[in-house]
């Protein structure tokens, strides 16, 4: 069992290592913004170095100490996932895809958590005005699918003139989290379909058994009816 658990912890660790290697490469080799972008697939897919002070895909809570709360949530969530994988791996009939999914989520959460906890101090990328360097690191994002970007027209309420992109810039940790969620959803759908198939198979089996029972009962009934129609004549 221990070997099985560490196998999936190893998957999470591999996701963290790959994520951190790419982030550090971007940090030391790329210029932030449009001037430093690297086109990988024409104008559609690029490496675009940017910093994200919030959660995955740039989501933020929007108050002064949201970064501290976010980091605490990441630490708690990571600890809970570690424990959950341990318990799940101990089950003899645990799904491999479910373990893969949670391992990828663990790797993604830990990868972005490292940025939040350490990068503000080590890479000095904490936002201006942050009360401390620790726990205020900004997550390094670099993967950009450029489907559309531009400024919203003036007639758009509340957000007129804002520069927006169709998809936010993300990183490999975000990809790992999304892939993990997808595997869990697929596993759940498969587990829902299996009982239905099993029930249908049981219905067929019960039907066959009922038919067999009728075949066994009918000769007995016919024999009883014959005796009833032709009673024995008593000797006088």
UniProtKB/Swiss-Prot annotation:
Alphabetized NCBIfam families for the sequence: PRK14788.1
GO cellular component: plasma membrane
EC number: 3.4.23.36
Organism of provenance: Amoebophilus asiaticus (strain 5a2)
Listed pathway(s): Protein modification; lipoprotein biosynthesis (signal peptide cleavage)
Domain of life (superkingdom): Bacteria
HAMAP family (alphabetical): LspA
An annotated Gene Ontology molecular function: aspartic-type endopeptidase activity
Membrane topology value: Multi-pass membrane protein
Subcellular location, record wording: Cell inner membrane
Protein name (Swiss-Prot/TrEMBL): Lipoprotein signal peptidase
Function text: This protein specifically catalyzes the removal of signal peptides from prolipoproteins.
Active-site feature positions: 141, 174
Keywords: Aspartyl protease, Cell inner membrane, Cell membrane, Hydrolase, Membrane, Protease, Transmembrane, Transmembrane helix
